[in-house]
């Protein structure tokens, strides 16, 4: 008889414990239900990279002096600088420059220590390819002008996940009806146009006032 009641007590204890853990899981679920959605519908939606994002490296052939500083400061000696010595001018002549982005860790040392600023970091991060050999960019591919996420009209950049208002550290703390942080390029252009038009109207008003003053003084 005592064994029967002991089994009932153990079963009740396990049931209470299971219910407790179930409620804890539901509490986490309900907490996430009240949060803002963070799913990015890539590639139709993209995050705006930060201002100092280290993306694809941009290279300017005309500025390079083949000093190979980028090779020495690279942790894996990645950049390949092909040059020959000109016996007449006794200077290096650059033939080719390449970086393999399949191996690059995007540390930015080459950009930081370049004496002529021929290297710069862009905000391009879509470098995936089917063939890893296609990730070996030569000076022509590196010299291609970088593309911006905000310049693609088919993409809606998610500003609230890229920049948060001052003092906000968690994007889930923002109310659902709050305005997004930052502005789209189109909104910035409209704002600049309105500002210029208002400025021109103010200038015209000042000119009219000054002309009236001159006429009054002449009379």
Curated annotation (Swiss-Prot):
Main location: membrane
Catalytic reaction list: a plastoquinone + NADH + (n+1) H(+)(in) = a plastoquinol + NAD(+) + n H(+)(out); a plastoquinone + NADPH + (n+1) H(+)(in) = a plastoquinol + NADP(+) + n H(+)(out)
Cellular component aspect of the GO annotation: plasma membrane-derived thylakoid membrane
Pfam families: Fer4_7
Mode of membrane association: Peripheral membrane protein
EC number: 7.1.1.-
UniProt subcellular location: Cellular thylakoid membrane
The UniProt record lists the keyword Iron: yes
Domain 4Fe-4S ferredoxin-type: from-to ranges: 55-84, 95-124
GO terms assigned for molecular function: 4 iron, 4 sulfur cluster binding; iron ion binding; NADH dehydrogenase (ubiquinone) activity; quinone binding
GO biological process: photosynthesis, light reaction
This protein's UniProt keywords: 4Fe-4S, Iron, Iron-sulfur, Membrane, Metal-binding, NAD, NADP, Plastoquinone, Quinone, Repeat, Thylakoid, Translocase
Binding annotation for [4Fe-4S] cluster 1: 64, 67, 70, 114
Cofactor binding notes: Binds 2 [4Fe-4S] clusters per subunit.
Cofactor: [4Fe-4S] cluster
Keyword check for Translocase: yes
Binding, [4Fe-4S] cluster 2: 74, 104, 107, 110
UniProt record similarity statement: Belongs to the complex I 23 kDa subunit family.
Function: NDH-1 shuttles electrons from an unknown electron donor, via FMN and iron-sulfur (Fe-S) centers, to quinones in the respiratory and/or the photosynthetic chain. The immediate electron acceptor for the enzyme in this species is believed to be plastoquinone. Couples the redox reaction to proton translocation, and thus conserves the redox energy in a proton gradient.
Quaternary state and interactors: NDH-1 is composed of at least 11 different subunits.
Protein name: NAD(P)H-quinone oxidoreductase subunit I
């Amino acid at each position: 008889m005592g064994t029967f009641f002991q089994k009932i007590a153990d079963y009740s204890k396990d049931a209470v414990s299971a219910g407790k853990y179930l409620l804890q899981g539901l509490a986490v679920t309900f907490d996430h239900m009240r949060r803002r959605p963070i799913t990015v519908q890539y590639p139709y939606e993209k995050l705006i990279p930060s201002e100092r994002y280290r993306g694809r490296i941009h290279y300017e052939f005309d500025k390079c002096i083949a000093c190979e500083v980028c090779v020495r400061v690279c942790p894996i000696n990645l950049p390949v600088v092909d040059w020959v010595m000109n016996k007449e001018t006794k200077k290096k002549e650059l033939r080719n420059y390449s970086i393999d982005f399949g191996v690059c860790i995007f540390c930015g040392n080459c950009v930081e220590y370049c004496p002529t600023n021929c290297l710069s970091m862009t905000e391009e991060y879509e470098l995936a390819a089917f063939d890893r050999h296609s990730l070996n960019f030569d000076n022509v591919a590196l010299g291609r002008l970088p593309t911006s996420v905000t310049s693609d009209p088919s993409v809606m950049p998610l500003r609230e996940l890229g920049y948060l208002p001052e003092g906000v550290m968690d994007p889930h703390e923002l109310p659902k009806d709050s305005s997004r942080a930052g502005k789209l390029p189109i909104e910035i252009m409209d704002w600049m146009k309105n500002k210029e038009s208002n400025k021109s109207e103010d200038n015209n008003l000042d000119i009219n006032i000054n002309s009236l003053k001159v006429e009054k003084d002449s009379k």
